[in-house]
Amino acid sequence: MILLDNIEDPHNLGAIIRTANVVDAHGVIIPKRRASGLTATVAKTSAGAINYTPVAKVTNMTKTIQELKEKGMWFVCADMAGTSMYQLDMKGPIGLVIGNEGDGVSKLVKENCDFIASIPMKGEINSLNASVATGVMAYEILRQRL
């Protein structure tokens, strides 16, 4: 499952839905407000994945995480200050939380995650586009499960 904490760019949302499909995620969860909706741009960028990948809109992301935790899911959020994703065991039922393009994962959502994961980087720039970060982390989760 991929949860998006206020992703605003419809191109990012479409690319993430496409990634969710190719890594066989169960779906994508987005907030009802303060984020990109399911627009024609999202559909086009998803390259058709929007037709096969469930997308749920929720009112409260934190409450959604808490409810899914009660059903046995664990949550890992992407953050530059986290533990290297290669050091985490992400083989079980994982919800991958990706934050807003400018602000990252909100404080309350981050506090409800079980792990905070970072993507090791070498260059002068220390951040990735939200959809790229989603792809890198989603493929690490998939790799661990193979």
Name the predicted role of every residue range.
Residues 1-146:
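Post-transcriptional modification and biogenesis factors for structured RNAs
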